[in-house]
Amino acid sequence: RKFGLAMTVGCILLGMGAASASAAEPITASADCCTFTAPSYTQAAGETSTFINPVDATTFHNAVANDLGPDKKPLFASGTEPAGGSSPVQGTQYLAPGTYGFYCTIHGSAMDGELVVDSSGTAVPRPSVKLSVLNQKLKAVRNQGKLKVKVTGTTASSGISISASVGSKKLGSVSKVNVAAGASKTVVVKLTSAGKKALKNKKKVSVSVKGSVPFGKPASASRKIH
């Protein structure tokens, strides 16, 4: 009986803990244009907020951060939603505790609000990658029309875009690359016609690669190949 009572009490306490756990307040547009339903919304660090445009809304809305992140794009942003639509506010999971302004890009700064991130959670590490141009023969790159680049995930990263160039001339690019934290993969950048032309009759070149990842810092690398 004592064991059963202890189990019952434990389950009750567990349920209370779950009920009191922090949950991000949805950022919600007002039905009447053009405001949000509250001046501020709260979430724990590490959570991904949600934007909601109510079913009786009269127009499209979104929620986009005022400030830019390390990728030179908004710190966070929802999709632009019709009446009854909703979408995750991507980027909020990386925010440190603090207060962040946002607005609807359709209706301007008159439709704005604040997102308050508290310290009851832990922010997700921002996407981060390292790049390196693999050792390869220039003749093979030129003839095969392919440049091999190694991508290493310092943290889990998705939607990576990589471009390769020689001086001011672009060789080619690849996008939608994903890599897990601590993992590496070889990515093939296919040369464009202009890229192949840039390597024609060259005996040695310095190849530069640049990578961008949503919500993370850009990465770069270079190597001389001959």
Task: Show which residues each predicted segment covers.
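Short proline/glycine- and polar residue-rich coil/turn motifs
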Residues: 80-86, 177-185
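Bacterial N-terminal signal peptides
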Residues: 6-16
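Extracytoplasmic copper-binding redox domains, predominantly the cupredoxin/blue-copper superfamily
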Residues: 21-131
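Short glycine/proline/serine/threonine-rich loop/turn segments at secondary-structure transition edges
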Residues: 96-100, 195-207
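Acidic, Ser/Thr
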Residues: 52-56, 152-154, 192
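Beta-strand-rich extracellular modules
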Residues: 54, 105-109, 192, 210-216
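Extracellular glycosylation-rich, acidic/polar low-complexity regions of adhesion-
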Residues: 125-174, 203-226
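Exposed aromatic-hydrophobic patches
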Residues: 87-93, 184-193
